[in-house]
Amino acid sequence: MQESFLFDPVPPDSNETLEEINKELLERARALPQLSGRVFILGEGVKGARLALVGESPGPPDAESGRPFMGPTGDLLERILQAIGLKRSDCYLTNVVKYISTGDELTNDILNFFTPYLQREITAVKPNIVVTLGNRPTKALLNSKKPISQMRGVWQDYRGIKLMPTFNPAYLLRDPTKKREVWEDMKMVRDALTASS
């Protein structure tokens, strides 16, 4: 890939629709040889959702259903949301990269291709709060080099939107000892949502 879009300006009050953003993303992604034949899983939820959750990339259960955050990772995410009084349908769910990939496959070129679309997606949804699930989503939106272990639990600002970095539910399935930290982060999200309603 030759194109680098990471720092393209995104109008803060864009009137783009999610449909327009997704159409452009799919047209451009399908034209790239390294992405041909991929199954793309786009964001799910409504414009105006108060909470947006951003993961790294879809997993195999997502491809089967065509929806983000399915299977064991999605089940755990739904339990986390229920614990703070939300349902999946209350939120907007998306990933930085829109196709199933391995961690090794996520080069800077791939991330630079997808990040501006994620930024435009967040602008179109207009959530009150964004929760980034893991290193790559946090770096994509905040352009930070710090690991998630140093970023989590501290409110960040993303273009005037409160952003809470935390661990990805997929990581919690591998290391359940981090659940307490995610619970502390999500209580802060719950309190901020309550205060803004």
Regions found by a protein language model. Name each.
Residues M1-S197:
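A polyanion-binding, active-site-adjacent surface
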